[in-house]
Amino acid sequence: MLFHVKMTVKLPVDMDPAKATQLKADEKELAQRLQREGTWRHLWRIAGHYANYSVFDVSSVEACNDTLMQLPLFPYMDIEVDGLCRHPSSIHSDDR
């Protein structure tokens, strides 16, 4: 199942800079691993915002939820999730 996810990061202004740096490094490491595994299929920065649009390829709604909840920045994110299905006019054979 494919899910379109908008993630907006909202770190507290009084967060210790060292903690913020570590959280971002941990997030990057996990995000890149999930991309290599094929779970996190697409990742785009939203220009001018500390936010991204992503596409996740997981087995279920629960798997999507579990994947998002393991992200180190999860407690500091506003997240919107929409399920996706293949469009009948798409010419791409890898749409699922």
Curated annotation (Swiss-Prot):
Top EC class, one word: isomerase
Keyword Zinc: no
Domain of life: Bacteria
Catalytic activity, EC: 5.3.3.4
SUPFAM superfamilies membership: Dimeric alpha+beta barrel (SSF54909)
GO molecular function, one term: muconolactone delta-isomerase activity
Record's catalysed reaction(s): (S)-muconolactone = (4,5-dihydro-5-oxofuran-2-yl)-acetate
Protein name as catalogued: Muconolactone Delta-isomerase
GO biological process, one term: beta-ketoadipate pathway
Alphabetically ordered keywords of this record: Aromatic hydrocarbons catabolism, Isomerase
Keyword match Magnesium: no
Oligomer status and interactors: Homodecamer.
Protein family per UniProt: Belongs to the muconolactone Delta-isomerase family.
Protein's gene: catC
Biological pathway: Aromatic compound metabolism; beta-ketoadipate pathway; 5-oxo-4,5-dihydro-2-furylacetate from catechol: step 3/3
InterPro entries referenced in this protein's UniProt entry, alphabetically: Dimeric_a/b-barrel (IPR011008), MLI_dom (IPR026029), Muconolactone_d_Isoase (IPR003464)
